[in-house]
């Protein structure tokens, strides 16, 4: 694919420096071979996450200066509510400091008794954790295409609707809620079609099961629908988003992705009734007062601007095109990845790239460590290392994939950076047997990948 020129110009820069391989080896050992333990200043190209790592626009920075820091009822809150309400169409919308805060507030209100199931097209890590912390059992139910990284299909993030109906038939009242993750991060940032969202919603409501949208990448999903779903090519992204949100009863959102802010999130409830009142009580307990939700007024202003900027068609065309450019280079080099690429990242299939490693040796994490050691590039595992142990048996859980995620921050890196990444991955792919596996030497009980300590298996 030909590289799409940036639809913006750069007004501010930050120097980055390359370390030596010897320095990186020492840094990696001091971090206990955990990507989250690396000092950011020792990273040359940081693809750990696209969450909160984007570059804000001049309009967002100007909005920061308008921040009203009133404790209650500030105009920045009112501005955000006007923008969010017009885009998403929900009666009650609550700012929170980030996506997992919305999950912490909402999940205990959905899971009413221990052992209830919450079914998703696929959970991401924090959502899965909060279902478990609320006493529920997270169940992944993605379509079969999403489980084959080599298969090219337009909407590999879709819910398996037939599988959902089977789960409902088997478990009935034991299903507390259904979560629709858009885009579907854990299977490669793959989009979900409007048709699938509609069908899932219809099945859920036939059985009186609430649907929650995990909408961190709402704009990228809308762009894929615009490009790939029949009858959507002449629709605006804003119009597509409005329909997407009609197929949910509530939503949680990390605004640090598509709204391109460094901190912030939203929680929405379609009908301002009993659930909304319970949400308000939890927000006051966990996040602060309702009209700031753990954020400064300046953050609310930047978020209001970013929600609109994320829906710009030229921006989304470039954004997805940049990921496609990286994917095309890796494909030419024979590197296996979840195909087609997602909206925010290339998910390298490390299980296929490093066949000499067993899944319990964490191939996705092993490749991430090697990429840092060789080139100073930080990425992360989306696989069994990311998944916590089974809460009942304490056994390791095998993930559908062993991915290494190259998540590209928004408006930060250029074509040359993508070329460096492609070259580094290609070099490793030529001699995959040199990459060692890893074992965990210490781990916490929940969300272990953030703070675990590991060592290479020599």
Per-region residue spans from a language model:
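Conserved PLP-enzyme active-site core in the AAT-like
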Residues: 2-33, 37-39, 45-54, 60, ...
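Flexible glycine/proline-rich, aromatic-decorated loop/lid segments
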Residues: 137-140, 269-270, 274-279, 298, ...
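Acidic carboxylate-rich catalytic motifs and surrounding loops in phosphoryl-/glycosyl-chemistry enzymes
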Residues: 254-255, 341, 382-385
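Short amphipathic alpha-helical segments
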Residues: 263, 344, 402-406
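Short, conserved charged micro-motifs
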Residues: 274-276, 355-363, 411-420
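PLP-dependent enzyme catalytic core of the Aspartate aminotransferase-like
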Residues: 310, 374, 386-458
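Active-site loop ensemble at the mouth of alpha/beta enzyme cores that anchors a bound cofactor
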Residues: 323, 351-378, 393-399
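Conserved glycine-rich beta-strand-loop-beta hairpin in the small C-terminal domain of fold type I
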Residues: 323-324, 338-350
């Amino acid at each position: 694919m030909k590289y799409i020129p940036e639809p913006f110009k750069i007004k501010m820069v930050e120097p980055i420096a390359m370390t030596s391989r010897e320095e990186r080896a020492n840094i990696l050992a001091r971090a206990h071979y955990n990507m989250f333990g690396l000092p950011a200043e020792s990273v040359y190209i940081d693809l750990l996450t696209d969450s909160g790592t984007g570059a804000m626009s001049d309009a967002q920075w100007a909005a920061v200066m308008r921040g009203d820091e009133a404790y209650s009822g500030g105009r920045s809150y009112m501005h955000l509510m006007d923008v969010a309400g017009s885009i998403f169409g929900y009666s009650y919308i609550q700012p929170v400091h980030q996506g997992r805060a919305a999950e912490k507030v909402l999940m205990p209100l959905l899971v009413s008794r221990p052992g209830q199931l919450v079914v998703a097209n696929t959970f991401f890590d924090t959502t899965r954790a909060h279902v478990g912390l609320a006493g529920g059992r997270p169940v992944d139910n993605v379509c079969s295409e999403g489980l084959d990284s080599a298969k090219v299909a337009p909407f590999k993030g879709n819910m398996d609707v037939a599988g959902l109906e089977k789960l409902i038939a088997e478990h009935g009242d034991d299903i507390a809620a259904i979560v629709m993750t858009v885009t579907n991060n854990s299977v490669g940032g793959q989009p979900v079609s409007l048709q699938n969202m509609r069908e899932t919603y219809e099945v859920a409501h036939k059985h009186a099961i609430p649907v929650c949208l995990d909408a961190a990448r709402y704009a990228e999903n809308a762009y894929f629908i615009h490009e790939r779903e029949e009858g959507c090519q002449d629709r605006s992204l804003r119009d597509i988003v409005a329909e997407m949100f009609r197929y949910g009863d509530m939503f949680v959102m990390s605004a640090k992705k598509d709204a391109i802010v460094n901190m912030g999130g939203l929680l929405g409830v379609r009908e301002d009734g009993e659930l909304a009142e319970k949400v308000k009580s939890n927000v006051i307990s966990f996040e602060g007062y309702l009209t700031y939700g753990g954020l400064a007024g300046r953050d609310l202003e930047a978020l209001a601007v970013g929600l609109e900027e994320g829906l710009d068609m030229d921006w989304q065309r470039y954004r997805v095109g940049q990921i496609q450019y990286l994917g095309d280079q890796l494909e030419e080099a024979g590197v296996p990845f979840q195909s087609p690429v997602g909206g925010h990242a290339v998910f390298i299939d490390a299980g296929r790239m490093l066949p000499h490693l067993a899944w319990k040796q964490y191939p996705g994490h092993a490749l991430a460590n090697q990429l840092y050691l060789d080139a100073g590039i930080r990425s992360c595992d989306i696989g069994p290392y990311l998944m916590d142990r089974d809460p009942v048996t304490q056994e390791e859980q095998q993930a559908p994939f062993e991915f290494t995620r190259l998540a590209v921050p928004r408006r930060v890196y250029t074509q040359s950076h993508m070329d460096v990444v492609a070259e580094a991955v290609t070099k490793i792919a030529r001699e995959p047997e040199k990459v060692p596996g890893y074992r965990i030497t210490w781990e916490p009980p929940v969300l272990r990948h953030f703070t675990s300590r590991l060592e290479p298996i020599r």
